[in-house]
Structures are given as C-alpha cells and as structure tokens.
Design a protein with these regions (language model features):
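Acceptor/aglycone-binding surface of glycosyltransferases and processive sugar-polymer synthases
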Residues: 62-70, 96-176
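Short aromatic/hydrophobic "clamp" motif used to bind/position activated sugar donors
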Residues: 86
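Conserved catalytic loops of nucleotide-sugar-dependent glycosyltransferases that act on lipid-linked
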Residues: 136-235
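Cell-envelope/extracellular polymer assembly enzymes that use nucleotide-activated donors
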Residues: 1-2, 31, 193, 198
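Short, acidic, metal-binding catalytic loop of nucleotide-sugar glycosyltransferases
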Residues: 19-29
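Terminal low-complexity segments of carbohydrate-biosynthetic enzymes
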Residues: 220-283
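N-proximal low-complexity "stem/linker" segments adjacent to membrane-targeting elements
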Residues: 1-20
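A conserved acidic beta->alpha catalytic loop
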Residues: 36-45
Length: 283
C-alpha cells in the first residue's frame, strides 16, 4: 500500500504529515512517497528527514512533458509507486495521526465493490487576520470552493453525488486498478474529476466516505480560490456537459492606485489520459 503526498513549498508541514504516517511503515503501509512539484524551499529535505521517499515531478515519466497543477502531480505519482491501494494526503495538514490512513483504507479492505473512499472532517480553519475560526466551514462541513462551486454544481449536474460531504477533499484512498483506469483532471479539478468518473464507470456503490475527525490546514486567499474554483467547475462541465470546450483564462480584478485592473490567470484544463492507456500507447 502506498501513501502519496503531493507537495509544493510545504516545508513547515510536510515533515509532520510523513512522521504521522511513518509508524505504519512495514505493517499496513509499504511506502510513503512525497512527489515534489518544484518546491523552492526545504520541502524535499524535510520530507526525507521524516522518512519519506522523495521524487521530483519531472523525474517521473521523464519523456512526458510536465504540465502545471495538482492533478499532474497525482497522475505521475501512480508511476512512482507500486501499492495495490493508494492513499492521497495533502502536505499542509497539521496535527493528524496514523488513523487518517487506517480509516481511509478500512472500506477498501472490508466492503466488496468499494474502489474509492473519500474522507470528510471538521475544518477549524483559522483566519490569519483575526485569529477567529471560519464559522462557515464549521457549520457546513466544506470549504469555500466546496460550498460555493462544487456542491451547487453537483446538485445541478450529478445529484446522485449530493451526499458526498467533502467532494474536493485531498484525503482519500482508492484501488490502483481504479486510478489507473481513469483520466486525471488538471489542477485542482482532480478530486472532483475522480469522484465523477468513478461514479460514471463504477456506480455509487463503489464510493464510500469515512469521518476523519478534524482537519487543520493553511488558509488560502480568496483570489487564489477563484482560480481553484474555475478548475473545479471546468472538470465538472467536461464530465457532465457534452461538448464543453474547456475554460478560458480567468479574469480577476485587482486594485491598483485607486483603479481596478484586470489580471488573467491560466486555468489548467487538459486531462491526462488513464495511466494504463499512457503506458500502452506511450503518448
């Protein structure tokens, strides 16, 4: 069984995540792999010190040109690992224990037909400007992109998945057989893309959820979340609306000297093919 942590400039937290999982090495877990997507800080060193194997994103499938985004890192991680089961954990988690991994694996090991297990949790997000909790996240169970983009999109276009508490959560487990059979959406659309594609190809009974208790993580700016929401929405539309052409760059506006100036951000939209297809065709 493989535990995968995608990481980009997470030197403050990645070592703690690896250390939390390390007690399971040699028993339930065969390998802990941190896939570094170009960190400029000490992420790789901290991960190695904590006991993980670190691979660079561009060192995996080196003949395939690298694209930006989280989905790219997770897709390449399949080629860098070997476990029949794969657990994905975000690298910015704080105060987690090995029970995260144990609980995510439970349904895969005990329930016939389950191929994807999504974690859900309470999110006591601290707002850095005030030190106060994000009460919206506490009351709804999801973050801002989940509540304002993902959940309404699923309700409108795939209501069978409306019961998924954390459709965008970065803590989940799946069989390698499933993961290598599915395309990986680019960027932050990867989690909802895998959820939708699992439902399409395997049905609702292939998806399980587990309560992981509390998830503490870093805060991201509203502007950054706008680009995340665009990638999530594009992944949904590509899978639920035939003929959807893909997203254009996202135009946001920033205040400069009393004026509002447009600022375009690229939206990662191109799916990677199933890894099984990539291996078979080499393209």
């Amino acid at each position: 069984m493989s535990v995968v942590l995608p990481a980009l400039d997470e030197e403050a937290t990645v070592g703690g995540v690896v250390a939390a999982v390390r007690p399971l090495l040699g028993t339930l877990v065969d390998e802990i792999v941190v896939v570094d997507s170009g960190s400029t800080d000490a992420t790789a060193a901290r991960a190695r010190e904590a006991g993980a194997r670190v691979v660079r994103r561009d060192a995996v499938l080196p003949d395939v040109p690298v694209r930006p985004g989280k989905g790219e890192v997770l897709w390449r991680s399949l080629a860098a690992t070997s476990g029949d089961l794969v657990v994905f954990l975000d690298s910015d988690l704080v105060d987690l224990g090995p029970d995260f991994v144990v609980n995510l694996l439970g349904p895969l090991l005990t329930v016939d037909g389950v191929a994807l297990v999504k974690g859900f949790y309470h999110r006591p997000l601290r707002l850095p400007s005030s030190g106060m909790a994000d009460t919206d996240a506490a009351l709804t169970g999801g973050g801002r992109v989940t509540e304002l983009t993902a959940r309404p999109a699923l309700a409108a276009l795939r209501p069978e998945l409306a019961g998924v508490v954390q459709p965008l959560g970065g803590e989940y487990a799946a069989t390698r057989e499933l993961l290598e059979s599915l395309p990986f959406a680019a960027g932050y659309g990867v989690e909802i893309g895998l959820l939708l594609d699992t439902h399409t190809t395997r049905g609702l009974d292939a998806i399980a959820q587990v309560d992981l208790g509390v998830r503490k993580h870093r805060h991201r700016s509203l502007r950054a979340l706008g680009a995340t929401a665009a990638e999530v929405l594009d992944a949904v539309l590509r899978r639920c609306v035939p003929g959807h052409p893909g997203a254009d760059p996202l135009t946001q506006f920033v205040p400069v000297d009393g004026d509002w100036l447009p600022d375009e951000q690229a939206v990662a939209t191109a799916d990677r093919p199933p890894l099984a297809t990539q291996r078979a065709t080499g393209s």
